Each structure stands twice: as structure tokens, then as C-alpha cells.
Amino acid sequence: AKPSDKKIGGAFYSRFNEFRKPRVFTSYMGTITTVLQQGHELGHAFHYWLMRDLPVVQTEFPMTLTETASTFNEAVIRRYLLDRADEKEAFGMLWQELRSAANFLMNTMVRMDFELAFIEERKKGVVSAKRSVDLMRKAWHEWYGDSTVGADDYLWAYKLHYYKTDQLIYNYPYTVGYLLSQGLLTELDRRDRDFMPFYRAMLRDTGRMTVDEIVERHFGSNASEPAFWEGCMKGALGSIRRFASINPNN
């Protein structure tokens, strides 16, 4: 869609099962953020396109696997740009990497903890705005500690995911997808030219396997063991160390 100062950036992916075709709408605003946003949605489209010949029932994958190809696409784009960046550009790209890590590993979990607490409160009756703020502050402090001044008190009021009545707890799947995408980067480095057959096979299984089964069959690991997820986090931790070593004034 044509950019305009009267618009905000945005993108979404959809699919047409009858025609077996994915579609992406996006507004390119001339920023790296919108490039990554486009990459995210194209990851969704590629995921479905790989499954287009399967029975429709096998193309319906759980939310925990929905965000894997999309976040992996983002990660690949960031890596590509980072490999070709000078130190000043690398600082900006690593900042984007750290923003993603903080969003998927911390902010997303704040949203989930708040939503779970809100559901428990709602069982007792109507939850007031004041009580919602209290619940958000508690969840925020659990994850951010004293690293921020205050909390995003009204995140519950403006975050669209809370109002998708057909999908409860639509938060943590992003964390699972992010961690799996980091694991996929490790597989990309390890497999090199053999990566794409592995990746295609994994994505095609997402509509007929659980996360645990995907991890066991394709990664050869146990999803119930913290070691697998800690291994997936190594890439993000490496980006933090590299970011800390760069002087932005150079």
C-alpha cells in the first residue's frame, strides 16, 4: 500500500484455503522496522505456501508453531544486514535484535502472566480498571524487576491480542516462535546447504505434530528439558555481548 503521513505502518497475512494461496498486505514506511515487519508476514506466507498441497486439516497448525517461520524470517534478515554492516550500522541492527529479544522473552511473558491473572480475577466477578492496572504492574515487576521506571500500566487496554475472543492467551506463542527461530539459526549454521530440506520438512509437519513432537523429530531434542530452550537463547545472548562491545560514537 502507498505510504502516507496520514497512515501508520502495518501488515498482516491471510490465506485462501479454497484457492490454496497466501496473501500479505503491508505498508512500507521506509524504515528497517517495516522491512522486518514485511519479512515477518512473508514468513507466514511461505509457511502456508509449503503446505498448500496438503489436506486442509493438516494446514491448521497450533499458535505455538504459527510464529516460527515469521520470526525466523526476521532473524535471517537481521543477520543478513548485520553481516554487511559497518560498526555504526551494526549498532543499529544489534539494537533491533535486542529489541526483539526483550519483546519476545520479556514483554510477551508479561502479557501472558497478566492475562492468566486477569482470567482468575474474572471468575470472581467484574475486574475494574484499577485492579487491571494492579495486575499489570505485578506482572511487569515479575519480569522487568527494577530495570524500568514504572510499568506500562495500560498495556491491557490497547494491546489488540487481548480482544481476540477466538484466541485466548495469544501471547506466549510469540515467545515459542522466537526461541524456535533462534534454534533454527543454529541449525542453519550447522547444516549449511542441507538446511532448506530440513526446514521445509519441519514446516510441513507443523499441522500434524505438536511442539514437543517437532522438537523431538526435527531437532533431536526434548522440549520438556530447559537445556533445549537455553540453547535456543544462546544467539540472543551473543547479540547482547556484541552490542555491549560496540562504541556507537565510532
Where are these regions (language model features)?
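Short beta-alpha connecting loops at secondary-structure transitions
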Residues: R23-S27, L54-F61, M93-S100, I119
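Short, solvent-exposed segments of well-ordered alpha helices
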Residues: M29, T33, E60-T64, A101, ...
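Post-HExxH zinc-binding segment in Zn-dependent metallohydrolases
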Residues: P62-A90, E97-R99, N103, G177
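Conserved helix-loop functional segments at active or binding sites
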Residues: S14, H44, Y48-P55, R79-D83
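C-terminal, non-catalytic "cap/extension" segments appended to globular domains
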Residues: K2-S4, Q38, F46, D83, ...
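Post-HEXXH active-site segment of zinc metalloproteases
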Residues: L36-Q37, Y48-A75
